[in-house]
Regions:
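Secreted/periplasmic proteins that engage bacterial cell-wall peptidoglycan
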Residues: 1-91, 96-98, 105
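Intrinsically disordered, low-complexity
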Residues: 1-19, 101, 111-134
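Short loop/turn segments immediately following the C-termini of beta-strands
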Residues: 107-109
Length: 134
């Protein structure tokens, strides 16, 4: 199953893997990791993904010369009133990126939303987890 096929199959769904706090952004990433990549889920909140060291992944800080690629897990810091993140941050799955924008599969942004495609800028993006060799 290719990434874009998995995205299409999950678009518009409300994914709540842990059955706590409703459909959170972390639930989407956990589903991506466990159901698509067949890897263990990462513990914690979205903001924790910027500090974690996961087998097979490398953290890439957000700088003007770095861009995520399809399949990277993008992490936003928080709280940030301008972009609407809380202290828990936000995470989403990168699908495409340019110097000014990135297209992601996101959930719970805006709060309560199901999975949706969202064109974002880089405000409050801390960086992304990138699969080694991916």
């Amino acid at each position: 199953l290719a990434l874009l096929e998995w995205v299409k199959a999950n678009l518009g769904r409300s994914i709540d893997l842990d059955h706590e706090y409703g459909s959170q952004c972390v639930d989407l990433v956990e589903s991506y990791l466990t159901n698509f990549l067949r890897m263990p889920a990462w513990p914690g909140n979205a903001i924790d993904f910027s500090r974690g060291h996961y087998p097979g992944w490398v953290w890439v800080p957000n700088t003007p010369s770095n861009f995520p690629i399809a399949g990277d897990v993008v992490v936003w810091g928080g709280p940030n009133v301008e972009v609407g993140t809380t202290a828990f941050g936000h995470c989403a799955i990168a699908l495409a990126a340019s110097p000014n924008t990135l297209l992601v599969l996101s959930q719970n942004w805006p709060p309560g939303s199901p999975t949706l495609l969202k064109l974002m800028d880089y405000r409050a993006v801390l960086g992304w987890q990138h699969r080694r060799g991916g």
